[in-house]
């Protein structure tokens, strides 16, 4: 099955990611991969205030939080932060 979902992320979330280098490359590769693999399981899950189940995936030194809006075929990235926080 070939899935293609749009991935939405607010540009400000990338402020914590280095401007270049291996860490940025890993984060960007993961973000891009969500387009074809939107249901990638995270290392952890939680629920937001409207009860969306959110996946939290640790990629290198960063934790990326996202949820899938399946009816409109989108992945919403809602947080990127240092994985040690």
Predicted regions located by residue number:
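Arg/Lys-rich, positively charged N-terminal/basic patches that mediate binding to nucleic acids
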Residues: 1-31
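A near-ubiquitous, low-amplitude feature marking generic local secondary-structure context
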Residues: 10-17, 27, 42, 49, ...
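Glycine-rich loops and low-complexity Gly/Arg-rich segments
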Residues: 28-33, 81-84
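Intrinsic disorder/low-complexity signature
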Residues: 33-34, 76
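Short proline/glycine- and basic residue-enriched helix-capping loop/turn segments at helix->loop/beta transitions
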Residues: 35-39
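Basic/aromatic recognition patch in beta-strand/loop cores that engages polyanionic ligands
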Residues: 43-85
